[in-house]
């Protein structure tokens, strides 16, 4: 199985571990970063749709992009999913498995393996640059990433565990992905007092990270083994959903 997980906007500035691999699209990321570094703070704030404070932080990051110390991607992000993935406490065996089976989706680097070296940055799907042929960045990546993802899954067992988000599906020709490989997308719901099921963003992100950790620690081989996942009251509900969308309910 191959696993897909989204990156996070919040990033650590340092990591204790050194990366062991280079991003597949490092040269593309370099070109994008160089163009971002040519903008002033106001232009960055507009492109990234963020505050002046965040724009200033990332203006500095892009100016230091080529010389900043790299850290492994899986240890660089600090969003909700990554807080529950707790990558810093994974064993060497789990990290070795992750390096072969986990892809991290990313608007700047495209696709990352967990131990690829990256530097702190911020990038949004709507950014358009000369380097992207003036296309929004998610459209720019589509032709580059679709075959990479499909080929990596086919070279494994033909199954993709989709724990990324809908926003990052636009990095790929997602219709083609679903036609050529088997996509399993776990869904996480909280049962309301009236019995209705509701997806809550914070819980969904937390569970995605925790499920990645579960897969890595147990080195799962089949999607059926996901049924053993339980976390913070979420349990597999076999009576709900279908095989492609296993439901986990709290």
Segments the model singles out, each with a brief description of its role:
Residues 2-6, 159-162:
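Short hydrophobic beta-strand segments
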Residues 87-242, 247-250:
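Internal, well-folded beta-alpha domain core
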Residues 4-89:
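Active-site helix-to-loop segments that bind/position phosphate- or nucleotide-bearing substrates
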């Amino acid at each position: 199985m191959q696993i897909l997980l989204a990156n996070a906007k919040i990033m650590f500035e340092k990591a204790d571990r050194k990366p062991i691999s280079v991003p597949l699209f490092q040269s593309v990321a370099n070109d994008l970063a160089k163009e971002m570094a040519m903008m002033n703070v106001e232009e960055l704030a507009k492109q990234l749709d963020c505050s002046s404070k965040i724009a200033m932080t990332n203006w500095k990051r892009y100016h230091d992009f080529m010389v900043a110390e790299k850290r492994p991607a899986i240890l660089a992000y600090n969003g909700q999913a990554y807080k529950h993935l707790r990558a810093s406490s994974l064993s060497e065996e789990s990290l070795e498995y992750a390096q072969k089976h986990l892809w991290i989706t990313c608007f700047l680097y495209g696709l990352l393996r967990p131990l690829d070296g990256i530097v702190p940055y911020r990038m949004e799907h709507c950014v358009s640059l000369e380097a992207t042929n003036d296309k929004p960045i998610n459209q720019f990546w589509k032709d580059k990433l679709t075959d990479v993802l499909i080929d990596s899954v086919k070279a494994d067992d033909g199954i993709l565990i989709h724990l990324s988000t809908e926003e990052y599906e636009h990095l790929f020709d997602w219709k083609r992905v679903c036609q050529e490989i088997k996509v399993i997308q776990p869904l996480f719901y909280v049962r309301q007092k009236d019995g209705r099921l509701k997806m809550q963003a914070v819980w969904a992100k937390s569970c995605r990270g925790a499920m990645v950790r579960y897969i890595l620690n147990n080195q799962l081989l089949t999607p059926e083994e996901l049924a053993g996942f339980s976390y913070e009251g979420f349990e597999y509900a076999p009576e709900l959903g279908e095989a492609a969308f296993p439901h986990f309910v709290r």
